[in-house]
């Protein structure tokens, strides 16, 4: 094949990448946000170099909210936040802000669907009618053992 899309965790994506690279050094590897964690690089090593990944936050962002989250997260967990940490932070902020914006008798769901965007680590988060968040997608590639956001 010319390319392979891995919709797996970081651990499985790293293992698959190693097996694939044993057989084909040239195939393009793509992975979902689920694999976009430091574990991918730790476990995958050279096999994940050049892998292209989807992400909903820019690891290189200079946004003040993301900088604050990074500081607190690193102090507590001794590592940078990944997609799950940022998503949990944004979800919590959205719910707390929606509760503050809610008027007496108003359903939280309705507030979250109609009163966004809500502040997040990088930018505001709003929700569609199904409750899915609307975010700016980012594409990253693994280069020299780091996720680099493509511009």
Regions found by a protein language model. Name each.
Residues 1-151:
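Extracytosolic ligand-binding ectodomains
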């Amino acid at each position: 094949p010319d390319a392979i899309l891995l919709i797996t965790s970081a651990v499985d994506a790293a293992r698959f990448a190693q097996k694939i690279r044993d057989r084909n050094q040239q195939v393009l590897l793509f992975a979902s946000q689920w694999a976009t964690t430091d574990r991918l690089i730790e476990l995958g090593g050279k096999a994940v170099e050049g892998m292209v990944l989807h992400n909903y936050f820019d690891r290189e962002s200079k946004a003040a909210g993301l900088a604050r989250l990074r500081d607190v997260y690193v102090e507590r967990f001794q590592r940078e936040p990944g997609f799950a940490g940022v998503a949990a932070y944004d979800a919590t902020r959205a719910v707390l802000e929606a509760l503050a914006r809610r008027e007496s008798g108003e359903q939280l769901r309705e507030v979250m669907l109609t009163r966004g965007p809500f502040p997040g680590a990088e930018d505001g988060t709003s929700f569609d009618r199904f409750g899915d968040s609307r975010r700016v997608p980012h594409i990253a590639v693994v280069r020299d053992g780091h996720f680099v956001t493509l511009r």
